[in-house]
């Protein structure tokens, strides 16, 4: 993330009255990966939680890597992320307490309907990326260490490829999120890896089509991590515990997640995945 944006974010959290975690009370600060914000699920959860519990949640959006960096400064109470390796590192270094499963959706590989690389219908993302690389067809990456970028790089690794060359374009504004990245990809007639929720939210505004989907490697797990109060005493631990309990409840947020997007898109944008939800469905 650019240095000036870091400064703006820190000013928002530290200098503006009413937005400091140090004030405690009925207020939770959340640093969230951008995709769930763009889809509307974060706002829907925040609004219903405030109605149910009278506790306000406010968020700042950033790629997972940047969101975790904000939390490492102690400027938020909770993080919503989707990059397991970065999340585990964050916890191991003492910044967060635990990785709590919340929900999941999936990534898809999108590209022009004409499909110059010939990947449509391939069963695995690895096969598709090999063909894109092998044909030198334009591919756009966020390149910002966000959860989406980390997932993309894991897929390249599974394919045994280190992407580089004129065909592999790192979008200079990738840190702004998946929607701008998807629009840029569309303008270039290129391929990219994107979460399905983002694609569905603007599919009527772009020409790109979903070409590869359904590979287990494309699943996108989203979790929440409470920031460690032992490291940052000003963290609003009490209200975070209430929020996490509500988020993971099969009778509360998990039902909202289950149904979110059905009316508009004909299918949900996310699937509930808390331990409590899985247990209630007969899982382990």
Residue ranges, per PLM feature:
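Positively charged n-region of N-terminal signal peptides that target proteins for export
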Residues: 1-4
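Bacterial N-terminal signal peptides
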Residues: 7-17
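Exported/periplasmic ABC-transporter solute-binding proteins
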Residues: 21-52, 56, 65, 69, ...
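Short glycine-biased active-site loop of nucleotidyltransferases that positions the nucleotide triphosphate
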Residues: 71-72, 100
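Acidic, polar ligand-binding/catalytic clefts
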Residues: 78-104
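Residue-level signal for tight coil/turn positions that link beta-strands
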Residues: 104-106, 136
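Serine endopeptidase catalytic core focused on the charge-relay Asp
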Residues: 109
């Amino acid at each position: 993330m650019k240095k000036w944006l870091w400064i703006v974010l820190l000013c928002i959290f530290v200098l503006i009255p009413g937005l400091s975690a140090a004030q405690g009370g009925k207020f939770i600060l959340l640093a969230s990966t951008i995709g769930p914000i763009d889809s509307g699920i974060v706002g829907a959860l925040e609004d219903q939680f405030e109605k149910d519990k009278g506790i306000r949640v406010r968020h700042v959006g950033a790629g997972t890597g940047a969101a975790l960096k904000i939390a490492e400064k102690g400027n938020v109470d909770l993080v919503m992320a989707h990059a397991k390796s970065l999340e585990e590192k964050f916890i191991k270094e003492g910044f967060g307490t635990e990785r709590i499963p919340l929900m999941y959706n999936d990534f898809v590989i999108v590209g022009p309907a004409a499909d110059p690389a010939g990947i449509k219908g391939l069963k695995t993302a690895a096969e598709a990326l090999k063909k894109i690389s092998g044909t030198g067809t334009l591919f756009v990456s966020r390149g910002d260490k966000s959860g989406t970028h980390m997932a993309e790089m894991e897929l390249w690794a599974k394919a045994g490829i280190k992407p580089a060359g004129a065909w592999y374009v790192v979008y200079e504004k990738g840190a702004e999120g998946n929607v701008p990245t998807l629009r840029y990809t569309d303008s270039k007639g290129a391929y990219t890896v994107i979460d399905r929720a983002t694609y569905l939210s603007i599919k009527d505004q772009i020409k790109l089509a979903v070409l590869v989907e359904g590979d287990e490697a494309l699943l996108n797990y989203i979790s929440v991590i409470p920031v460690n109060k032992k490291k940052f005493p000003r963290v609003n631990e009490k209200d975070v515990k209430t929020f996490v309990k509500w988020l993971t409840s099969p009778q509360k947020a998990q039902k909202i997640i289950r149904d979110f997007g059905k009316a508009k898109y004909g299918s949900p944008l996310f699937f509930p995945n808390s331990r409590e939800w899985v247990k209630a469905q007969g899982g382990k």
